[in-house]
Swiss-Prot record:
This is Large ribosomal subunit protein eL14. One of its GO terms (biological process) is ribosomal large subunit biogenesis. The lineage of its organism: Archaea, Thermoproteota, Thermoprotei, Sulfolobales, Sulfolobaceae. Belongs to the eukaryotic ribosomal protein eL14 family. The keyword Lyase does not apply. The gene is rpl14e. InterPro entries: KOW, Rib_uL2_dom2, Ribosomal_eL14, Ribosomal_eL14_arc, Translation_prot_SH3-like_sf. One of its GO terms (cellular component) is cytosolic large ribosomal subunit. Keywords: Ribonucleoprotein, Ribosomal protein. GO terms for molecular function: RNA binding; structural constituent of ribosome. The keyword tRNA-binding does not apply.
Length: 96
């Protein structure tokens, strides 16, 4: 089981969407993945994100690589994860 995999639900740690949950849709390379909220559920737009800015959760969604926002939204509703996705997480920024 890989931690960074298509369908893994993660929490964004930085940026304007910090604390919001998103789903990994595609793996671009060793450092970047394509994520979506989708925007209608968690407010996260479909975009490329550095994996160091994500915190993976233990939940996954069964989607195919490159799935559309509508497909992701349908799977989230099917698995009953919509309320989980809407919850915000308080992000703790480490002090250096």
């Amino acid at each position: 089981m890989a931690i960074i995999e298509v369908g893994r639900i993660c929490v964004k740690l930085s940026g304007r969407e910090a604390g919001s949950k998103c789903v990994i849709v595609d793996i671009i390379d060793n450092n970047f993945v394509l994520v979506t909220g989708p925007k209608s559920i968690s407010g996260v737009k479909r975009r490329r994100v550095n994996i160091s800015h994500l915190e993976p959760t233990d939940k996954t969604v069964e989607i195919g690589k490159g799935a559309s926002d509508q497909e992701v939204e349908a799977k989230l509703k099917e698995q009953g994860l919509v309320d989980f996705m809407k919850e915000k997480v308080k992000v703790k920024i480490p002090v250096i």
